[in-house]
């Protein structure tokens, strides 16, 4: 944690960074297996973000589960669930299985009467992801759907996802 803070502050002062992307938030090596340490690391990042007006984005791993992508919640995190307490926003993202695309539909507005099916592409590089906004201190908590083309690393937000009624 001390090293992480030192690295971020070094770049902040030398390069005037405004954004930090931290791949897979986890505890420092001395505290592997201590669930509360992940919350401590998240608190350090949150304090840096607030005190230095930084945008800090991090990923967390989901636990292996059979939870449908639209039903994800904080209990699907592989790490300590208490990390949610210190986050401003928590988005849980999971790939929608190609074989279950027919079970989902999306709309362009959160409250809508027109829905669209998820198109099944022959190209295996085209995939869909559900994004459940589990926490948002700034407002709404929708469930969104994104289409990703892995070949070009292009993400398209399609709209609001739901299971077909």
Predicted regions and their residues:
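Conserved P-loop NTPase "ATPase switch" module shared by AAA+ and STAND
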Residues: 15-31
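Active-site-proximal loop/turn and secondary-structure-junction residues that shape catalytic pockets
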Residues: 26, 62-64
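C-terminal regions of RecA-like/P-loop NTPase motor modules
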Residues: 1-20, 44-52, 65-165
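Structural recognition of the conserved hydrophobic beta-strand(s) that form the central parallel beta-sheet
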Residues: 21-22, 54-61
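A short alpha/beta connector and helix-capping loop motif
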Residues: 32-48, 56, 91
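Flexible beta-alpha connector loops of hexameric P-loop NTPases
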Residues: 28-39, 68-75
